[in-house]
């Protein structure tokens, strides 16, 4: 995606066509390594750039987690309930969001922290039972400054009428419905 041709295509999609980009799990890893989140453009990472790294427990995790929608600034989250808690599957070994305190404060101030890992009461937490990878400030997903690029670790796409029927909680963040609505 750093090649000139791909960069031109990406620029046309995001800038000229007012498009959207979504990265879930490994897609989030790609977006953050490219700089599309948090910067909104492809640029090299610096030593202090936010990144995703190995889970704090040092191994792969696969389970259902609670995430809270912190902002619906992103078109991807327009139909999600602001402050709503969703039960989302995760499955990753390198999903821990790491950034300096200054970066995290900036992301919160800009409304770029989209979702956070929370406990059963909807409170962001560092408890590894709920924040399974040890993400700083319990951050599960972030956006570009304009919100049109969203990266998140939880698999919001893994929903359906016959999927995880024995799991309590709302599983539909309406991400794809929101994305379609954006273009209407």
PLM features: residue spans?
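A structural motif corresponding to the C-terminal end of an alpha-helix
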Residues: 10-19, 144-147
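Short secondary-structure boundary/capping segments
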Residues: 35-40, 167-168
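Catalytic nucleophile loop
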Residues: 14-35
């Amino acid at each position: 995606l750093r090649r000139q041709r791909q960069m031109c295509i990406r620029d046309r999609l995001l800038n000229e066509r007012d498009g959207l980009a979504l990265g879930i799990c490994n897609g989030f890893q790609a977006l953050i390594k490219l700089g599309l989140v948090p910067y909104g453009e492809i640029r090299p990472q610096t030593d202090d750039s936010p990144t995703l790294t190995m889970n704090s427990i040092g191994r792969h995790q696969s389970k259902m987690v609670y995430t809270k929608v912190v902002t619906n600034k992103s078109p991807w989250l327009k139909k999600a309930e602001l402050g709503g808690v969703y039960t989302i599957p995760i499955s990753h070994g390198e999903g821990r969001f790491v950034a300096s305190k200054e970066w995290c404060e900036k992301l919160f101030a800009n409304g770029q922290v989209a979702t956070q890992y929370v406990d059963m009461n909807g409170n962001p937490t560092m408890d590894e039972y709920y924040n399974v990878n040890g993400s700083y400030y319990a951050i599960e997903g972030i956006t570009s400054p304009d919100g049109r690029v969203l990266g998140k670790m939880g698999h919001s796409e893994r929903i359906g009428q016959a999927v995880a029927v024995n799991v309590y909680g709302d599983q539909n963040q309406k991400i794809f419905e929101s994305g379609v609505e954006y273009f209407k």
